[in-house]
Amino acid sequence: MSQSSEECAADQGQTCEETQKLQVAAASIDVEEPCSSPHLMATSLKDQTSEETQVSKDVEEPCSSSQLLMASDQDDSEDETASTSSDLQHPYDSSSESTEDLDDQEVQGSPVIPPDQSDSTDLPVMTVDGKVDFLVNYMLYKYQVKEVMSMNDIMTLIVREDEDRFHEILMRASERMEMVFGLDVKEVDPINHCYALFIKLGLTYDGMRNDEYSFPKTGLLILILGVVFMKGNRATEEEIWEVLNPMGIYAGMTHFMFGDPRELITDEFVREQYLEYQPIANSDPIQYEYVWGLRAKAETSKMRVLEFVAKVHGSDPTVFLSQYEEALIEEEERTLTMLLEHADSSSTSGESSSDTSSNFSQV
């Protein structure tokens, strides 16, 4: 094996180890009966590994070699399809296992290193779990360079002798991309079997920076939107950190994926209008809470977030009865609003046509 391949494997393993610790950690808050309100969403970042990269926001032809992978995943029901992986654990478990914090390793992340296609024979022999880890890393690299992935490349570089387990490896890697990073992996060219990455739930934000150490932040954003909704459409700072601390994410402590988490949540998510950060009325000393911002309300919905929560929980949205009923009401209101807007538009168009016909007849 060449020295460059050894370094690549070492860097990948280091970051994968850190991400595994993050995903295994679950919130240490007890969950009561599933349909009681409010519930706390705590994303189980279980069995998810990898290194990350950066992204831009434009979309081009889905299978071009320089494909730009952004994206808003508008009106795609595939976002909420049920998980089929048996190793995706429930994040709401009251007996959530605790793990060591990421800071124990003092790793601040390492860049995604692309596999060298010409030197693929020098890659180390990997277990199936290792190949899942490596594929997640490869997916994030492709997200960074705005390219699609082909089945042929994945087979050649990663799956290799485990050809009969391709779909298992792809599925497990895709679930980790979804649960940790808020990204969906979808086949965009069924003929050539090309896959692209899309931001989940209709959101258009991933928080990527223009450097090789940048990680997608959408997974954390979805987690917090879920906490806010499940806690009754408002969550105190304390409630947010009760979810994040068991995952090794602490206010004022630099995280290898998220940098300064408090700054990210309180400044960037608020600035991007996904959250509003406001004082709690009549609190003494003053306390603060988070609610959904205008952009979150415009881009996604309570039903989409609830379906994601249920999927992570390995359950059905109807299990969370009060939240499900609330989400249904919002869906009905949105549908009614759209119908009224369409009716107004049709009426205006009809009046315009009538006026035009009248003018012609007068001439």
Curated annotation (Swiss-Prot):
SMART domains in the cross-refs: MAGE
Keywords of the record: Tumor antigen
Region (Disordered): 33-124, 342-363
Domain (MAGE) ranges: 128-327
Record has DNA repair as a keyword: no
Biased composition, class Low complexity, residue ranges: 82-97
InterPro entries tied to this protein: MAGE, MAGE_WH1, MAGE_WH2, MHD_dom
Protein name from the UniProt record: Melanoma-associated antigen B16
Phylogenetic placement of the source organism: Eukaryota, Metazoa, Chordata, Craniata, Vertebrata
Gene: Mageb16
